[in-house]
Amino acid sequence: MSGVRNRRSMAVALVVVALTAAASCSSPTASCDRASAIAGQWTYAATRESPVHGTISGSLAITAVNCVDLQGVMDVVETLTTGETRRMAGPVSGTVVDSTLVRFEAELGSGGGSREHFARVIGDSLAGTWVETTGGPSGAGPFSGRRQQ
């Protein structure tokens, strides 16, 4: 009987250690106070550098920040050098990594696919890179934003 109890205790202890290790390895280092720096309305301007060049402009709204998790919506128009123009909009979700670094993914409809963004937030400015991870031909390029007052 004590052998079964010892095995159960050992199994519970291993699960607790594994969960603690996983949580500590995956948790961003941002404090909850600094996480709110990304919340709000932003302009969004990007360049598509591959496979077809183009420009992307519109808005990014970060509407919910729960310590390190963020959510919002992106609404943009992409204009390619081929003359094709398309409006894309969809939900945004991501993580505040530290006091100035954010990572978020925009799930854009109308063939925009999923676009991963990595950016620095400095005051009322946002700048970084994006890459298309699903959807049409893979695209990538720089982007920036300004907080709207």
Regions found by a protein language model. Give the residues of each.
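Short, solvent-exposed aromatic-acidic interface loops
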Residues: 48-50, 73-82, 87, 108-113, ...
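N-terminal glycine/threonine-rich, aromatic-flanked beta-hairpin/loop signature
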Residues: 52-97
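Charged, amphipathic alpha-helical segments
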Residues: 27-29, 56-57, 112-115
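Edge beta-strand at a domain terminus
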Residues: 31, 59-60, 85-100, 123-149
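An anionic, turn-rich surface loop/hairpin at beta-sheet edges
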Residues: 88, 92, 100-118
